[in-house]
């Protein structure tokens, strides 16, 4: 099994990790209650998806 011959410097390690950025999730507004929600998912606030009631949400 292959092993590294030389140690990589911290600057090389950090240059490689420079592209590991985490992106903020895209949010869409629920058409029913106007609360932000993840796209293509049931709204956690009102429980609707594509205009239909999917979840019973306690209010």
Swiss-Prot record:
The keyword Transport does not apply. SUPFAM superfamilies: Zn-binding ribosomal proteins (SSF57829). One of its GO terms (cellular component) is cytosolic large ribosomal subunit. It comes from the Bacteria. GO terms for biological process: translation. GO terms for molecular function: structural constituent of ribosome. Keywords: Ribonucleoprotein, Ribosomal protein. Belongs to the bacterial ribosomal protein bL32 family. This is Large ribosomal subunit protein bL32. It comes from Thermodesulfovibrio yellowstonii (strain ATCC 51303 / DSM 11347 / YP87).
């Amino acid at each position: 099994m292959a092993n590294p011959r030389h140690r990589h410097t911290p600057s090389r390690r950090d240059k490689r990790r420079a592209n590991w950025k985490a992106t903020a999730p895209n949010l869409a507004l629920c058409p029913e209650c106007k609360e932000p929600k993840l796209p293509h998912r049931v709204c956690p606030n009102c429980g609707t998806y594509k205009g239909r009631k999917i979840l019973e949400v306690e209010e």
